[in-house]
Amino acid sequence: MAEGEGYFAMSEDELACSPYIPLGGDFGGGDFGGGDFGGGDFGGGGSFGGHCLDYCESPTAHCNVLNWEQVQRLDGILSETIPIHGRGNFPTLELQPSLIVKVVRRRLAEKRIGVRDVRLNGSAASHVLHQDSGLGYKDLDLIFCADLRGEGEFQTVKDVVLDCLLDFLPEGVNKEKITPLTLKEAYVQKMVKVCNDSDRWSLISLSNNSGKNVELKFVDSLRRQFEFSVDSFQIKLDSLLLFYECSENPMTETFHPTIIGESVYGDFQEAFDHLCNKIIATRNPEEIRGGGLLKYCNLLVRGFRPASDEIKTLQRYMCSRFFIDFSDIGEQQRKLESYLQNHFVGLEDRKYEYLMTLHGVVNESTVCLMGHERRQTLNLITMLAIRVLADQNVIPNVANVTCYYQPAPYVADANFSNYYIAQVQPVFTCQQQTYSTWLPCN
């Protein structure tokens, strides 16, 4: 796994680990109350280790209990079968998120790696809380809050996840000669490992051709854990996972486990209002990594608006950090192309608007570059926008436009017949087949 590659977004605020709070009926008290899956030592000190401060026992603004409609959406996401597509001749795996969590957690326990709790993170969590946010969701981010003390634990996590994939191969597949390296090449979209003084986490992303990757994130500690308030939500899954295992009856509005949502931005209701009203807000913007600029422009394109006029300062911070993290023009191109590929699946018509929004923000708020470096990046964004237009065969806001140029006078000479027209891909289909004096420049 690449050291320090990629960025995994959650919040700098202390992550609470509230206990599982069952409803009445079969789940009241007894062996399940405050059970093995919730609670414990998790949280504190800006990392995932240490003593837990339970925000939900002494109610604070960080947590909120999901209502029945939200519980139903969460159940639908965890119960949905997601295809993990294999490269080459490898068969497609059919994964249920709740099942892969169960298998991975059990195998890690067998290897003596403790998982304090499991959470749904990112845009999927935001979708559960508010379906009409305009964000949608692609990747399914599942966080395993785990003890990763050294290199051995990181390697064990990797081996366990790859080994678990064998369980999901279709019947009849000979598993004996399939190695972990083979599984990695066949089914893993990317692997990331970060291990330094402030951050200890790893990511294994399982491939889906429609962009709906299943991302398994194993986090011991993380310095900066969110970018904006609208993506700061986490939903604690342990009570629902326990319900799946122990209840013989289906969930109903009057019989379902209590599920806790949390905003690691700080104030849950404030963050939820931002989500419902499409407002962009954050804390400590100087700590947002380089990818925050791309996320910010994505929010703008989706109709979100800044919470205050101080957004110009925020834009300058994000532009500066982007050029710190991606200083080389080649790195910038790879990052932008990757972002377009991963975040606009099925939304190709928005790519041009996104790139023009990014161009405007970079042009207006970049203060940390020499003039030629700034122009170089702006030219890169423009080039990508032109490529998008060529792929879509459209020019925005202009209908039925053809550009012409006038050839040299001797072309009109009846004896001249040696003119060569370069064969290029036109932006617009041209109906005329021959030209007497004027030639299309496309």
Swiss-Prot record:
Molecular function terms, GO-annotated: poly(A) RNA polymerase activity; RNA binding
Location, primary (coarse class): cytoplasm
Compartment list: Cytoplasm
Key words, A-Z: Cytoplasm, Disease variant, Nucleotidyltransferase, Osteogenesis imperfecta, Repeat, Transferase
Substitution effect: D141N: Does not elongate poly(A) tail
Catalytic activity: RNA(n) + ATP = RNA(n)-3'-adenine ribonucleotide + diphosphate
Free-text tissue specificity from the UniProt record: Widely expressed, with preferential expression observed in the retina compared to other ocular tissues. Also expressed in osteoblasts.
EC number(s) from the headed UniProt entry: 2.7.7.19
Name of protein: Terminal nucleotidyltransferase 5A
Provenance organism: Homo sapiens (Human)
